[in-house]
């Protein structure tokens, strides 16, 4: 029996993680969860899974739940509450499914507490990959990727030696606007952007997919997880999202992991590792009805956010922190209807250009740089 803590249990990855726990009551049990401000999600979690601890985002939600569950479930709130969920004594595995850089400190605390990390929060490695990987190595803690692309690479590398790897190839659907021209992108709406062709995801990551910043973050994440330089991490467009990623070896052999687009598969793989469990609710791949798979090169002029991510990753230091902070603020402004779609990439580029890089930022540096980049992007609205 593995006890699971989910940071972000009311979001897309979090709810699908609950599906996996629900499907295997003899394998997994929910020890703790965070749910943001979603009081109803907290009530449902407590009723079904009886976790020992539930974290909420603010004091108002805390007051409501504390009155209802005092003496039955520990209710905590704020950043400290999120950390408490991350270091819950009963938890064996912590699923980091919160969105954005808010996941960094709880992840570091969970690593320090010796928890296995099922990593769904890619921003953690984007802003502080050097700190996270060093902490995991120091504590001997496994980082198990939940992103479908990194899970695919991780699976392809089982039993292999990294010195035999030539390159990693991440696949990308192209997002909700893959068939639109740059001219058409100037006028797209929020509603159009939120319609991903293949995956069901939260709002922020769906926009990141449309700009391809999500793929840029995944390139940086792959660099840290697998230790390869950026020159040996490629991205290829693959409309069907059936091949989740590939590994090419030095003898030109290629291994790929395939499957229908269903995030419960990589989630379950991370939770159950090194075992493989059945997943009856997942749809098996039917090659006959599939017919064909399609691939195309990435146009870096078309997807400027992906180019910016590669550049920030290669230069390293504090630039990926600025990349992430500026992206979060710009995407929030787009979702609020305050800026057009193409302004997202423009604002990120401006934030990167004004930043004076720090070569080896520590946690306090990262917090200051993050806050400064956010303040700058917000100032562009006024």
From Swiss-Prot:
NADPH binds at residues 10-13, 36-38, 121, 123, 202. Pathway: Isoprenoid biosynthesis; isopentenyl diphosphate biosynthesis via DXP pathway; isopentenyl diphosphate from 1-deoxy-D-xylulose 5-phosphate: step 1/6. Its EC number is 1.1.1.267. It holds the Pfam family DXP_reductoisom. InterPro entries: DXP_reductoisomerase (IPR003821), DXP_reductoisomerase_C (IPR013644), DXP_reductoisomerase_N (IPR013512), DXPR_C (IPR026877), DXPR_C_sf (IPR036169), NAD(P)-bd_dom_sf (IPR036291). 1-deoxy-D-xylulose 5-phosphate binds at residues 122, 148-149, 173, 196, 209, 214-215, 218. Mn(2+) binds at residues 147, 149, 218. Its cofactor is Mg(2+); Mn(2+). Keywords: Isoprene biosynthesis, Manganese, Metal-binding, NADP, Oxidoreductase. Signal peptide: none annotated. It catalyses: 2-C-methyl-D-erythritol 4-phosphate + NADP(+) = 1-deoxy-D-xylulose 5-phosphate + NADPH + H(+). GO terms for molecular function: 1-deoxy-D-xylulose-5-phosphate reductoisomerase activity; manganese ion binding; NADPH binding. Belongs to the DXR family. PANTHER family: 1-DEOXY-D-XYLULOSE 5-PHOSPHATE REDUCTOISOMERASE, 1-DEOXY-D-XYLULOSE 5-PHOSPHATE REDUCTOISOMERASE, CHLOROPLASTIC. Catalyzes the NADPH-dependent rearrangement and reduction of 1-deoxy-D-xylulose-5-phosphate (DXP) to 2-C-methyl-D-erythritol 4-phosphate (MEP). This is 1-deoxy-D-xylulose 5-phosphate reductoisomerase. The gene is dxr.
